[in-house]
């Protein structure tokens, strides 16, 4: 099990890696999952747009892109997070930057746990799962 935190073209956000990893592990366990190899790549809006275009053929900015490499109950994936979008969203929603960052960090894990947010009613289910996970910090 390894959770890594990397940057591409941005400064590493001020997160407590050990505590964050333990929190991620606990959230995964609450869904009956174990951590495999999880890589967080913090980047800029321009980088996430490039990844979105290249791998998903989507031509828009987003806060997170999750590449799922899970096997059975073991969560594995690459999670690209745009710190620019995190900042914009925090301002737009009146949220603290750190809270929005943690929301997006766990959002990717929840996707790996099988929770979707694109279909009817799924956004509300995801938001409820995010809030429950954030309360576990």
Curated annotation (Swiss-Prot):
A Pfam family annotated for this UniProt entry: YbeY
Alphabetized GO MF terms: metalloendopeptidase activity; RNA endonuclease activity; zinc ion binding
Keyword tags: Cytoplasm, Endonuclease, Hydrolase, Metal-binding, Nuclease, Ribosome biogenesis, rRNA processing, Zinc
Subcellular location: Cytoplasm
Gene3D superfamilies: Metalloproteases ('zincins'), catalytic domain (3.40.390.30)
Swiss-Prot/TrEMBL GO biological process terms: rRNA processing
The EC number(s) this enzyme carries: 3.1.-.-
Primary site of residence: cytoplasm
UniProt binding sites for Zn(2+): 107, 111, 117
Cofactor binding: number and manner: Binds 1 zinc ion.
Role according to the record: Single strand-specific metallo-endoribonuclease involved in late-stage 70S ribosome quality control and in maturation of the 3' terminus of the 16S rRNA.
UniProt protein name: Endoribonuclease YbeY
Species in which this protein is naturally found: Bacteroides thetaiotaomicron (strain ATCC 29148 / DSM 2079 / JCM 5827 / CCUG 10774 / NCTC 10582 / VPI-5482 / E50)
């Amino acid at each position: 099990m390894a959770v890594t935190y990397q940057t591409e073209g941005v400064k590493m956000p001020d997160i407590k890696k050990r505590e964050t990893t333990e929190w991620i592990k606990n959230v995964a366990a609450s869904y009956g999952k174990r951590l495999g190899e999880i890589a967080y790549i913090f980047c800029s809006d321009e980088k996430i747009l490039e990844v979105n275009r290249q791998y998903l053929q989507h031509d828009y900015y987003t806060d997170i892109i999750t590449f799922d490499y899970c096997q059975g109950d073991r969560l594995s994936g690459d999670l690209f997070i745009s710190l620019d979008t995190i900042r914009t969203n925090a301002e737009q929603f009146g949220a603290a930057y750190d809270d929005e960052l943690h929301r997006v960090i766990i959002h990717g894990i929840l996707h790996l746990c099988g929770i979707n947010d694109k279909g009817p009613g799924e956004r509300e289910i995801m938001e409820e799962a995010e809030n429950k996970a954030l309360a576990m910090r």
